[in-house]
């Protein structure tokens, strides 16, 4: 009996562990929130008391480089300050513009879906200016913000980068249609408690701030201040996985659909005074002292300059590059900013995770309700990534009945589809995994859904659960030749925290060490690894024992090759299970691409005819006709299935309704694997007289209504039969009504002609009368 009870208890424990990773654990999150509230209150009280005694500044502006604010004390009773890390280019850099309404992808994503409201949050240094015309009516302020005046310029700028409507098109936010965002101020240091509470409902939140570390120039003291321990050459907080980092990982583990995005920091150009110059430092009692800078203190200008909790495993940390205004084409397009903080973490993990545009980014600010300004910093790079990833969740939800990706899937997808950056293939400690490519990520979602993750699909997205002593294994046969890439991502349990007295010694933070392998023709392919002892060295292949993201790339796979992807684990899994996300991109069929021989738009009578001729359609799924009145915003008007032959095929779609002025047309061509291309744009000019009126309905039974689309003041309407005999004639004033009704119930069935004459010309249309 005892064995059965034990077995039952093990089953219950197994189920609880699995549920914690796949469903939001509200009970655990409530406990974390309560603990963090108490901790923040006590720490804040202690810090305020010590500030009065030791003359620490409570807050100060850093002359265009953000601000710092006292939020507590650290493990050594030194003051702990939060500091902020001071959109068309940003959107182009990460390939998000194409996802917007009117964009080339045709996906029309802007965050406006009803189920996305209040699923995005921002924590920042003060209050967002809710009355700014880019944001008005969409901000929900969740706390009694520290800044109760006209708002914070930094918080307003960051929020605008995520959601500004685009009244100024150059400052349009990534999720510009989102109807509601939650905003918090970080003034009291209780942001982690607030995040814990909101993680039950949020999908993403942005955090463009972090602990002040290393060097900072204080206007309060009029001097450079070294924030590290006296006698240390490097601030131990750089790369340090502290208690807050562990808490953030715990939150993510219990809220598996919530992803926190954080800025990496701007410390590489905060270098302190010259050697021998006067500087301030904190002694062992936390009292500020003054001395001459010794030779050995670091300039913070290289690797391992990301502070404390921004080194957490389960968050997404973002660095800053210069904008790529015309869009990415090659790795050298990515130019590193002078300030963006680099990895690795103390235990050698890859940070930052991704990079985005953070140099001279235009967004709204709080000067007045229509003001804008350009800021630089990882603070500006992070919100563009946050807003872009939010659109991926919107798209996934559309295709999956309102359900969302797990955060590990979203993070893994962003990394998997990122554009290469840096001097060598693979990840590095400067650019992380590269530049977010939001269009390719959206394509992966579309293709994996349309193919139901078939083994022949170009893109596959899998969410699964691994148990102890189990190996996930799946075999594929390549349908084409080229590069194969697989990415494994998982939300790892919180790692161990060490309290340190000096620059901390490395300790591995990875708890559940999963392994990704690809086996082809008896050869095992390993993931990328970096060497933290030589941080500038290029990535190599090997056993990654540090990161909770692994990626295997095979540069050359031949059509017909069989390969097996395996996911396993070392040792014993914490809790007995580990949820994971697997992303795969494999080369597709090598059949010849579609050849679009011609595409023409012609005005026929009073409507447009579109005709196109193709060849090599074997891989083509369909053609969607799109129209536009401005050449930017496109609407689907008709869909035609491809004939899927190698010979020439001719297509024609007639009677396309038109509007006065220039009408634009193009073809959206979808391949079998879900990838999309576009034809050239064709235009048709419609004079005002050609579009004078429309007949609804046509054919007509009892009544036919003429709808006038003209600026004419008066027109004459003549109805005649096929013999030219006038059935009805009427002079109309369009100043009182733009419609006219013809009774057709008493007319014999057949064809009739309606002629409308006005000052701009004469238009005749055919009317068909039928009687049911």
Language-model features, listed with the residues they occupy:
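N-terminal domain-start motif of subtilase-like serine proteases
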Residues: 25, 30-33, 37-122, 142-151, ...
């Amino acid at each position: 009996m005892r064995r059965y009870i034990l077995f039952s208890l093990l089953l219950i424990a197994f189920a609880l562990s699995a549920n914690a990773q796949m469903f939001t654990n509200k009970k655990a999150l409530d406990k974390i929130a309560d603990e963090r509230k108490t901790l923040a209150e006590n720490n804040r009280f202690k810090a305020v008391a010590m500030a009065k005694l030791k003359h620490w500044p409570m807050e100060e502006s850093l002359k265009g480089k953000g601000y710092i604010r006292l939020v507590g004390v650290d493990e050594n009773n030194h003051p702990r300050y939060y500091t902020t890390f001071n959109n068309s280019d940003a959107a182009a850099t990460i390939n998000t513009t194409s996802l917007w309404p009117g964009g080339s992808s045709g996906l029309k994503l802007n965050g406006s879906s009803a189920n996305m409201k209040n699923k995005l949050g921002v924590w920042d240094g003060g209050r967002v200016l809710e009355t700014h015309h880019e944001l008005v009516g969409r901000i929900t302020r969740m706390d009694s913000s520290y800044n109760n005046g006209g708002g914070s310029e930094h918080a307003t700028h960051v929020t605008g980068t995520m959601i500004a409507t685009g009244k100024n098109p150059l400052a349009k936010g990534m999720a510009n249609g989102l109807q509601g965002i939650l905003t918090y101020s970080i003034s009291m240091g209780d942001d982690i408690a607030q995040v814990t509470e909101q993680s039950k409902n949020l999908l993403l939140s942005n955090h463009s701030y972090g602990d002040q570390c290393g060097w900072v120039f204080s206007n309060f003291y009029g001097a450079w201040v070294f924030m590290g321990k006296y006698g240390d050459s490097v601030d131990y907080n750089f790369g340090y996985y502290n208690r807050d980092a562990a808490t953030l990982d715990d939150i993510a583990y219990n809220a598996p659909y919530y992803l926190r995005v954080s800025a990496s920091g701007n410390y590489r150009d905060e270098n302190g005074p010259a050697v021998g110059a006067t500087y301030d430092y904190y002694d062992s009692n936390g009292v500020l002292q003054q001395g001459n800078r010794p030779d050995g203190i670091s300039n913070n200008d290289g690797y391992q300059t990301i502070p404390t909790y921004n080194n957490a495993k389960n968050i997404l940390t973002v660095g800053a590059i210069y904008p790529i205004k015309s869009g990415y084409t090659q790795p050298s397009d990515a130019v590193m900013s002078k300030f963006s903080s680099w990895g690795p973490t103390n235990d050698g993990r890859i940070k930052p995770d991704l990079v985005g545009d953070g140099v001279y980014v235009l967004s709204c600010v709080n000067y007045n309700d229509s003001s804008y300004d350009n800021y630089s910093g990882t603070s500006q790079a992070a919100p563009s990534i946050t807003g872009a990833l939010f659109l991926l969740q919107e798209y996934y939800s559309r295709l999956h009945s309102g359900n969302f990706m797990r955060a590990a899937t979203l993070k893994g997808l962003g990394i998997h589809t990122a554009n290469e950056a840096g001097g060598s293939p693979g990840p590095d400690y400067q650019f992380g995994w590269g530049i977010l490519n939001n269009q390719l990520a959206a394509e992966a979602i579309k293709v994996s859904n349309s193919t139901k993750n078939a083994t022949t699909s170009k893109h596959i997205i899998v969410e699964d659960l691994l148990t102890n002593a189990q190996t996930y294994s799946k075999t594929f046969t390549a349908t084409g030749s080229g590069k194969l890439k697989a990415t494994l991502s998982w939300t790892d349990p919180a790692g161990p925290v060490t309290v340190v007295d000096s620059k901390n010694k490395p300790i591995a933070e990875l708890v559940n060490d999963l392994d990704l392998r690809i086996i082809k023709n008896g050869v095992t392919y390993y993931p990328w690894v970096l060497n933290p002892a030589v941080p500038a060295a290029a990535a190599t292949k090997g056993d990654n024992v540090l990161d909770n993201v692994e990626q295997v790339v095979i540069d050359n796979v031949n059509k017909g090759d069989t390969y097996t992807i395996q996911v396993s684990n070392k040792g014993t899994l914490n809790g007995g299970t580990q949820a994971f996300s697997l992303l795969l991109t494999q080369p597709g069929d090598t059949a010849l691409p579609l050849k679009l021989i011609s595409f023409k738009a012609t005005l026929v009578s009073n409507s447009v005819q579109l005709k196109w001729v193709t060849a090599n359609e074997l891989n083509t799924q369909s053609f969607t006709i799109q129209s536009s009145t401005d050449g930017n915003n496109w609407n689907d008007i008709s869909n035609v299935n491809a004939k899927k032959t190698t010979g020439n095929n001719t297509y024609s779609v007639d009677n396309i309704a038109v509007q006065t002025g220039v009408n634009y047309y193009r073809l959206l061509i979808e391949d079998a694997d879900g990838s999309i291309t576009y034809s050239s744009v064709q235009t048709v000019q419609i004079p005002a007289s050609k579009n004078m009126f429309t007949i609804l309905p046509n054919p007509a039974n009892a009544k036919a209504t003429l709808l006038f689309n003209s600026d004419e003041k008066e027109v004459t309407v003549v109805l005649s039969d096929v013999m030219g005999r006038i059935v009805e004639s009427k002079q109309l004033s369009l100043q009182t009504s733009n419609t006219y009704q013809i009774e057709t119930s008493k007319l014999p069935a057949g064809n009739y002609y309606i002629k409308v004459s006005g000052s701009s010309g004469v238009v005749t249309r055919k009317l068909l009368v039928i009687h049911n």
